[in-house]
Amino acid sequence: ETLKAELRENPDTYIWGQDMANGEKGVIFNVSKGMQQEFGPERVFNAPIAEDFIVGTANGLSRFKKEIRVVVEGAEFADYFWPAMEQLVECSHDYWRSNGAFAPNVTIRLASGGYIGGGLYHSQNIEGTLTTFPGIRVVSPAFADDAAGLLRTSMRSEGPTLYLEPKACYNA
């Protein structure tokens, strides 16, 4: 519901990623279910399975004007985000080097951690690596109750934010 509320609040908010606009699916954990029907294909749309392309395009789109916010389903699982690291570094460098003057207002959502019996490639925690990049916020709700406020703050902030969603919170 937080994603929908933020899209209603700011008409310059876009969300895109893998399986975002596939009917009633709403990505792997149904977080964006029904959003394309409400906000249209101009604001909620699919991306190819190419994590570097997803993040790089979000970075470029967010530069068009300061009010634009882009929420990215960066990879269906954090484990698959590694190909996007070069583009993430570009987001962080631009923000850091310009002291915030060039702010890619991008929130990258990643499902992180275990608890689904997914094995090696569906259960990794990558936040230790992500926190080493200057100019990027890395946040993760500890409890389901924290998720809405933290996501809202991430989406309204200037500069790039990685929002890591613990899989254990999805059904809490």
Question: Where are each of the predicted segments found?
Answer:
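Thiamine diphosphate
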Residues: 1-171
